[in-house]
Amino acid sequence: MSDWNEIQRLAADFQRIQLTASAHQLSERNCIEIITKLIAMNKVQVMYTIDGKEYLTPQQLEREIRDELFVHSGRINLVELQQVINVDLTHIDSKVKEMLRGDRSLYLIQGDLIDRDYIDRLAEEINDILQESGQISVSELGKTFNLPTDFLQTNIEKRMGIYIHGQVNPLERGTIYTEAYVARHAAKIRGVFSAITRPTSVSSIIYQYSFPEALLHDILRKLLDEKRLAGSVQGHQSKAIYTPNIYSRTQSNWVLSFFRQNDYIEYDSLTRLDITDPKNYLKKCLNKNVIFLESCVSGQNILGQVQAAIEDVVATPSWVDIMTLLPSPFTTGDASVLLQKHCLKSNKNNTSVQCLCDKFVVSNKFIQNCLQLFDDHMKTKAEKVYFHLLFIDAGKVAAKFASTSSTNPNHSTLTKHDDSNVTGGKKKKGDDSTSSKRKGKGKDRSTPDDLESTRSHIKQNKQDLEFMAIPEIIEVLQREHSNCEDQFLEEIASQLFSPLKRKYQEVAKSVFLASTSSVTSEKRKLHSDAQDKINGLLTNAKLFGKGLQHFSGDAHTTLGKHLLHTLCTEITNIVFSLLISEHIMVDSDPNSLNPETRSSALEKFPNNVKKAASALEKSLSGKDVEQFFDALDVVLGPSICQIMIKKLDKKKERQIIFNHRQSLIEQLNKESKPAMCLHLCTLLLFQRHTQCMIHAPGRCIPQIISFLKQHLTDEQYKTIYEYQQLIIQSIQQSSDKQKPEMSEEPKDSDNSNDNQNIDLQLQEKMTTIKAIALENKKQS
């Protein structure tokens, strides 16, 4: 029976299931696919949570943001909001910006979302603080509530009188006061300033009574505008000075009284009365007929006295010091302003007088009388110094052609302590070839064109000629006007200096023109002397050049440069000295010339002369002696220097070589220093075996000794070579002595003994070295 009942129950359940509608359910995966499809078709807008398990619509996100803002009392940070809602921060930033555009009651401040209710509650809290303290700073509020000062300032001003009961100082918007606080300080300020009787610094009042600075200035301005204080304020803020009216009236009365009695008043007097701007004060206090000077104000009476004195000066050729007419407080600057801007400007005779030293007034007639005192001196002096128009001191040449002067080497003199100057370059004056008489144009080089050029040069260089120095002019004036002040005479002398100079130059020019013929003969003599010197030096230079042909490579280059830097440079200096005298009209000593002065002189030469002289100058810095000789031939030619160069015959050449050898022998016999002794012996041996003169520096002696090896016996060469090595050791040890000691250990006496031994050997072998050179001489 029970089985049947069970069957019936199961049949009933089956029938009920068949009759019941089925409910279809989707899996989570199917849901995700459907939503993804809808998003792709733009049918729905949703955003994922950070864990990706939930979706939010934009509307739901906004509702949750507003709910969280409400829960956090109207202020929440966006980072904190992102953590609560569990949505990416970019979605929250985007939605908040959208909410800010549509809702003006929301603010985004420093990453915090704030609503208007929060600001209202904040204003109520600020009001409580204000009422408790009486004043409050907006910047302090910003630090307290972590909000920008500008944001707080704007919202506080909007709620002033509604939530906040106080006022903002217009001079200091960052501070808020209560009405009671302002009224209390206004009463104190009115009381303090009412008691002041003399000018007082407002900053000192602020410091003494601890008033708020901005509030005090605002209240003080209102009290003065409302006439509740009898006074005035000069300056602004920290430099403001309060002056009561009673003090101002006393000042004004004193100023007017002093001016009426003295017809002037000093600015310093007003400064001592605490008047900060005396000029503007006097413009308001005095009438318009006063004269404002540098240190004081003058009236019309003083001006009238000065004008009367000027009229007397015009009437009689005299002068006046107006400082004697002015009150003692007047300065020289005051006198200058009074004269230049008032007296002389309005005086009808102002063209007849001059103002000197800002205080002297002198008539032009008086100056003309002083000028005539020097007429008798001019012609006499011009006749004595007329040659100064042609020649300038040699010491001025360097200053004329170069900005700085330098020491000039003397290339023809043997310096025993400088190995760059060689005994081989020394010669006697008698060794120079004798000059021959000039022919053709060289005989008389002064032409009418030369005279015109000289006259033109004189016109251009008048500034080099002075009549008298200012102290000398003052002495003459003192003898004639002993009653005049020294300062006045100094100024008169300065006025006379230029007119006297111009007049004297005209007198000197006339004297010069009368003396042209004598000057021309002197120029011919200078040209002749230069020609003789150049011929002698050039002959020696060419003979030395032959000696260079026995060398090659670095030795040839070094010897060539040395010859260019010594004899060739000396020749160039003589040529440039001659050109300077001809074309620049100054007398220049060849020994005073250097590369700088020569380069400066080149710029002043005519173009054709400049080109040839530049080539000559450039050849000195080269290596080729023949290039120098070619450039020299162009400069010495008939178109420029007109120097005749004599050809050297064999007989004269042998005589010069013989004289040069005799000179070396004479020097060798007198020489006692080892290095110079070896130098002279080497030059003698070279000349003996090559029949050529050599002009060599000390650093080339080893190369010459190497060259002589083939001409000497082994014993002679060994002796000379060993002597050379001893000299090198001696020089090295001398250099070591000059180095600073690096240690404090006691010196070993071996070094000093070595030095003595080397010196002793050098002295002992010197006789042998000399004998080698002289024996070779005898064998010849």
Curated annotation (Swiss-Prot):
Q: Which GO terms describe its molecular function?
A: UFM1 ligase activity; UFM1 transferase activity
List the record's Gene Ontology CC terms alphabetically: endoplasmic reticulum membrane
EC number(s) from the headed UniProt entry: 2.3.2.-
Region called Disordered, residue ranges: 403-458, 734-760
Xref: InterPro entries: Ufl1, Ufl1-like_C, Ufl1_dom, Ufl1_N
Q: Could you list this entry's UniProt keywords, alphabetically sorted.
A: Transferase, Ubl conjugation pathway
Keyword Transferase (UniProt):
yes
Comp. bias regions, Polar residues: 403-413
Q: Which GO terms describe its biological process?
A: protein ufmylation; response to endoplasmic reticulum stress; reticulophagy
| Amino acid composition bias (Basic and acidic residues), ranges on this chain | 443-458, 736-750
Q: Does the keyword Cell division apply?
A: no
What is the role of this chain? E3 UFM1-protein ligase that mediates ufmylation of target proteins.
Family of this protein? Belongs to the UFL1 family.
Q: Name the chain's protein.
A: E3 UFM1-protein ligase 1 homolog
Lineage summary: Eukaryota, Metazoa, Placozoa, Uniplacotomia, Trichoplacea
